Amino acid sequence: MTELPPYWLRDNCPCAECRDPRNGQKLFQIHELPPDLAVAASTEADGHLEVLWSDGHRSRYPRERLDGTDEGDGRTERGKRLWTAADFAPGLPGASWEAYLTDPAEQAAVLAAVRDSGFAVLRGVPTVERQVLRVAESFGYVRVTNYGELFDVRVEPSPNNLAFTSVAIAPHTDNPYRDPVPTLQLLHCLENSATGGDSGLVDGFKAAAVLREEAPEAFEVLTRTPVPFVFRDRRTELRADRPLIDLDPKGRIREVRFNNRSTGTLRGSGLDAFYAAYRRFAEITLRPELQLTFRLGPGDCLVFDNTRLLHARTAFQQDGHRHLQGCYADLDSLSSTLAVLRRRAAALDTIAALFAGEGAAEYLGEEVTMAEHMLQAAAAAEAAGAPDHLVAAALLHDVGHFHGALHGTDLMQGQDNRHSDSGADWLAGWFGPEVTEPVRLHVAAKRYLCAVEPGYREKLSAASEYTLTVQGGPMDEQQAAAFAELPGARDAVAVRRWDEQAKEAGAPTPGFAHYRPLLAALMR
């Protein structure tokens, strides 16, 4: 590990002096590091590398931070599923709108399909106007263009774009005359009763990869020849000069811009080679095995990567109505939402593992296990009609027994493990104070209730009476008054009451999976 470049190591120091612990952003400028920076000493232990620097600074790196690989931004062909039409014979990727909205796993699967395969179809989106904006806003932000925040795809009397006619539209990407292009496009079908008007998709990355394999010289021409893409109407004039196939610095396909209708006049040398390559690429995109054709029905919303997929439409007769509404969005927000969903899912998996693993241990001498106790507390909160954040706090109030410096068994041996603080601190990585503060204060709430509520102490179980003494005993009058003024005191008292109810052997409760959607909705 110490063979890593010193400047790289120091630039990635994770300490609070170098990075803001709240957001991970650097607190120094690269030019502020000593020009002769060197490692003075280093040791490896417990999965960490500790470095003493020549300027006296100390850094401590987790091994996984040093061993990790750079996955990039997910925009290139690397890691994508390049496809042909036959790959979707079993069906198109997607989900019902209801499942997408209510199940984070379904939402993550849809967004992953857009990222990895380039598209997904949501079915059952209400067939009312402007719903396409709601779909875009479910994972990101609408990209407003000269067409507005949304546009209607239907026959117009004086169209400024062939998309607003009934003629066939060959495979293309949208808005190549913008820089940057809208990286996502959404099309929501409101009505489609006309004969014809089927939708088509072509994986532009796959087509480019085929060109690279069959005609590498043509591929190279299309990656290095800037093409003028132009759009003009009476209120707009747009132009962007970009190659048809754009590569990243490592030579991987990153973006395809292909729109015959918007290609301007190319000038300069090498025109014969360009047009031969252009024609070859166009012919590849029209190969039947690369063209995925399907029909959008009312309520279907197609979401696709406009930097990768070419979309098309067959001609349709005006013997019925065909009306789609579309809008643009961007991949960065979709990728961000997907990453957050996966991060939350990983956190929930960790919590679920606690319930299934350590949660099976006895609960401090009570007749229930740790998991049974917390599930009973959550069930009591739910039965009382408590808001979701308090159900979550009741469910998670004792996780600190697993994540403190001292285990729950230490508490029963006379050592205060401060599990309310360690649990709240651990949960703060995922939940806001509406969840964490009742967890943090639930032990104090027991001490408070014993001080101010006659008869409360007599209701405590033997184990709870013992831990009360270890945790400081009932509050005095001044402590109780101060506690009552705390912002989270009322919620903590509620959690405490459910805590005391949750010690009944064999009491039926929902499992952890029942609360998973509730927790997911509360996560930050």
Where are the language model's segments positioned?
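Metal-dependent phosphohydrolase cores
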Residues: 339-524
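Residue-level detector of functionally special positions within alpha-helical transmembrane segments
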Residues: 20-30, 118, 172, 306, ...
